[in-house]
């Protein structure tokens, strides 16, 4: 399994290489999109990479792809948009993703300033069964974002992008990857609009 690409190696094709740590001051016009996920089987990681591809397709974006356990406070607070993916565990987000959200305060101190306020947020999920809890999982992710006063958007589906990994279509199929790319693109487009508006 390939290791996740560190911030900010994934860039739009036209963008210049930036330092190892993100520097939005050095690239004030860039919109930073963080795609983060938990994956054991590789299915959610595959979706995450497609989400990142979609975000990367929007001109003016700087995209990072990281596992939730590798995200730092700097990654989180330097981003303009955050897209979180999880496998379905008992019709909910995985424990690793829940810990990631808990760490926003326990490790990174988002309160009382609401440091994630007005950042764009979105969710994606993978699950074995067609009705095994993917929408519920995405809604729990979005609820955590709303609790932090983020601006949540959809794309690829009503609540985000999802994939059914068992049955007639094991793994991730092309339609599900296309939905993941749509989600990434939608989030990046909204983040660009918001950042442009904030400068006016």
Question: What kind of feature is each model-predicted range?
Answer:
Residues 69-155:
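Helix-loop-strand module that forms the ligand-binding subsite of alpha/beta enzymes
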Residues 4-20:
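Bacterial N-terminal signal peptides
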Residues 20-26:
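Boundary at the C-terminal end of the N-terminal hydrophobic targeting segment
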Residues 48-61, 146-147, 151:
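Short helix-loop-beta junction
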